[in-house]
């Protein structure tokens, strides 16, 4: 109850604080009473949710045209099932791309709460048990990198509103939440993978193999095991370079140098090539203008599938077929290659990549592929044992009846018909097992591909910024401009820009 109260209190604080679009010193322009009145209005007058009928074709068309409002409305009108959190993550990002920064910030906070509640109800063992029916039968609760991106996007939305005070609140919350939110999820994923590693050594598999042997099908697992993905031994993704970068800038903008240094240390651990020294040590009499650019959409995982033939089905003399499905991360082809930032004083820079989120997906897939493969083999064995054992027994009996059929022609025809129906039923059942086997490739689709930044040491004053999103050949894909940016001496001023192409 305490966590719930804290969460809804935070929502009210968000409504109250995200009202100024030109705040660079962490102070709110409104009085306390005005904030309270604003919060009450927000609390009593929730915006009406617009809904449209969802079709994939219409959604893809709207997205290609940059009609993010229609995309949001279609996701709101979609039946979510076990993908409620997944659809919420996409909706929240699309609201950001549509410039609905306050709505997006609030929605990300609510989604984080739902993600945590779902995760609290799940353990590694429960997840393994839930996947017996199929990988996609489980409720989607989000990945570690999506949890971290949710914090980042809340901070980005606050910065887009010019509210560095609320942005500080977000990074403060992350620092306090890590042990209770991120660390348990990491432990839960490790527990699932550990249980999956031993999936083929369980009593369920041993019993299933024995059942198949009783009807003459001997399964050779050596060929199946040969295609198993390697166990991931690389560095786990437990911290975000981008979130640490934002933390360093936000704390510096809020006159919290010690916390800024803590974030800078985490940034060095996540991405040693990035330095925020110039951002944290602004020369006397100078200001610092940092332009953060989110470009493209995050790379997508796909299904990898391997088919194996093992054992021989009696009577039919055909092999038993397995389909093993698991996630993979193929080479990606992104539209935006780089970002160029130009200030109104003519200064220009190519933005430095702070984080490529494809790497987070790649790590997530590599960590999960082996466990998913083992669970897929588990399902193939146990489902075939449950289905094929009965059907093969019936097939053997029907074949015997055909060979021994005597009597009238009608009786022989009936026996032949029974045999044919048994064969058809067996084939249909085996094909259904193969058709049902699918990898879980769910993920948020509209998070950015890259977070980049360009920092400028400038004289205090008012500036405008032009952000150009460039293709591999240097041609401009899209240009975003912002004006009336006030830069003060001694601290960073942060501007954010996004392009989802």
Regions from the language model: what does each represent?
Residues 48-55, 82-87, 111, 146-149, ...:
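Generic helix N-cap/helix-start motif at coil->alpha-helix transitions
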Residues 285-501:
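Short loop/turn and low-complexity linker motifs enriched in small/turn-promoting residues
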Residues 15-17:
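C-terminal motif of bacterial Sec signal peptides marking the signal peptidase cleavage site
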């Amino acid at each position: 109850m305490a966590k719930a109260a804290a969460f809804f209190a935070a929502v009210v604080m968000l409504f109250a604080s995200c009202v100024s679009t030109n705040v660079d010193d962490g102070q709110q322009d409104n009085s306390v009473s005005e904030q309270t009145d604003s919060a009450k209005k927000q609390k009593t007058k929730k915006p009406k949710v617009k809904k449209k009928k969802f079709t994939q074709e219409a959604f893809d068309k709207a997205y290609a045209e940059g009609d993010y409002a229609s995309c949001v409305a279609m996701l709101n009108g979609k039946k979510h099932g076990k993908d409620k959190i997944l659809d919420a993550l996409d909706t929240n990002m699309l609201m950001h791309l549509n410039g609905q920064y306050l709505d997006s910030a609030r929605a990300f906070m609510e989604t984080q709460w739902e993600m945590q509640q779902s995760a609290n109800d799940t353990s590694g063992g429960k997840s393994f048990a839930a996947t017996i029916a199929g990988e996609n039968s489980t409720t989607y609760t989000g990945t570690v990198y999506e949890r971290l991106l949710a914090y980042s996007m809340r901070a980005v939305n606050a910065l887009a509103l010019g509210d560095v005070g609320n942005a500080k609140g977000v990074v403060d919350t992350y620092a306090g939440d890590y042990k209770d939110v991120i660390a348990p999820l990491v432990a839960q994923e490790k527990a699932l993978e550990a249980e999956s590693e031993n999936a083929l050594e369980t009593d369920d598999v041993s019993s299933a193999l024995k059942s198949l042997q009783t009807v003459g099908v001997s399964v050779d697992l050596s060929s199946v095991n040969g295609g198993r993905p390697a166990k991931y031994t690389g560095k786990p993704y437990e911290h975000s370079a981008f979130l640490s970068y934002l933390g360093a800038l936000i704390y510096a903008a809020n006159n919290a140098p010690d916390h800024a240094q803590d974030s800078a240390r985490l940034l060095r651990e996540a991405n040693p090539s990035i330095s925020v020294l110039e951002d944290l040590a602004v020369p006397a009499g100078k200001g610092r203008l940092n332009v953060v650019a989110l470009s493209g959409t995050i790379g997508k995982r796909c299904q990898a599938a391997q088919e194996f033939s093992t054992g021989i089905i009696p009577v039919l003399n055909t092999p038993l077929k397995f389909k093993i499905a698991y996630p993979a991360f193929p080479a990606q082809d992104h539209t935006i290659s780089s970002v160029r930032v130009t200030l109104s004083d003519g200064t220009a820079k190519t933005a430095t990549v702070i984080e490529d989120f494809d790497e987070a997906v790649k790590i997530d897939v590599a960590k999960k592929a082996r466990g998913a493969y083992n669970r897929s083999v588990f399902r193939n064995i146990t489902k075939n044992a449950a289905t094929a054992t009965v059907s093969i027994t019936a097939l053997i009996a029907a074949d015997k009846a055909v060979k021994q059929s005597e009597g009238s022609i009608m009786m022989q025809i009936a026996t032949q018909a029974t045999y044919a129906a048994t064969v058809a039923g067996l084939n249909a059942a085996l094909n259904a097992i193969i058709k049902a086997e699918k990898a879980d490739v769910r993920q948020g689709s509209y998070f950015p591909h890259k977070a980049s930044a360009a920092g400028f040491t400038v004289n205090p004053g008012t500036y405008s910024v032009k952000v150009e999103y460039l293709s591999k050949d240097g041609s401009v894909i899209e240009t975003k401009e912002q004006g009336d940016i006030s830069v003060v001496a001694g601290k960073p001023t942060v501007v954010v820009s996004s392009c989802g192409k």
